[in-house]
Amino acid sequence: MNTKLTLLAMFFPLFCFAQKQKDEIIVLNAYEDSIPSTSIYLKDRNIIYQKVFTSSLKQEELNNKLNAMLGTLKSFRFNSGVYTTQNEFFGFLYGHKFNVSKDDINLFNSTGYLTFPLDAVVAIQVKDYRYRITISSMEFVRDTIEPDNSLLIDYFLKQKSGLAIKQSKPNIKFATILNHEFNTLFNVEKSLLTTDF
């Protein structure tokens, strides 16, 4: 009797997990897929932009410079409804227009969405000499009367299963455009802020 219970205890996990299909396995807090040479990742089945920027400034100075820089961006709004700490704050990109050439728009002309404004959620975490920008829930919004006329970037970049990123040439170019736009938008060291009036 004890041998049967021991064998049952040993093989019980195998019986349980044998029923689980491959696409049901979810990896939490880890990148599931990415587009090479960009900061565009598939994490928890969502497309995000996440990058750590380095700086020569300590945390307090970096906080002040980030707040000043973000205050000058027309498309950025701080989220006053979320409690922020000294080293973390949240906001939204609202109606952000891409700074892209006509060639880039023509390359991605299958939808023409690069000409529409982008809305997204932004989280910023600050430490001494570095800060991390995480942008999620990215969607293009068309200015029409129709109530639900937006398209998530996940639609373009994810495979139907949601477990991987489509690695086609237009998707890689699109991710490169996103990556370049966000790198220039949130880089404190290259921002146009000056102390001169």
Residue ranges of predicted features:
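Bacterial Sec-dependent N-terminal signal peptides
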Residues: 1-23
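Ser/Thr-rich, low-complexity intrinsically disordered terminal regions
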Residues: 19-197
